[in-house]
Amino acid sequence: MNFLSHFYFDRNTPNANIVLGTILPDLLKNANKSWNVHPEKHIALFGKSGLNTLLQGWKRHLQVDLLFHSSSFFNNKMQELKRLLIPILKDSPVRPSFLAHIGVELLLDHLLIEHQQININSFYDNLEAVKANDLT
């Protein structure tokens, strides 16, 4: 799932750190593909309240991804899109399965916006509300 789709599940949380935590796994992966961060395996490092709520969001991200990526909806739509992409990407280094995966997620983000299921300003307001000293 992509950023707005993750936000959808926690759009009503009063804690901005949780919202940041729900998108942080994908943000880090986008920043550097070689980073393989697993804070959920080091819970003792997250005793401080701000860090703990960030970790709550991170764990929520993992739970939602596990459910979504194992759903028949996601897998069926990904396969449909992949079939359409295979001939287009035949000479490309981009794997059709990768692009289909991201494509389905971005389409879901688009649909959430189009059907006004999320408030984009609220998403960015939450990110802006995260206090730097909560994260150290």
Regions found by a protein language model. Name each.
Residues 1-98:
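An N-terminal structural lobe/cap that precedes and organizes the functional/catalytic core
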Residues 88-136:
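Catalytic cores of phosphodiester-bond-cleaving enzymes
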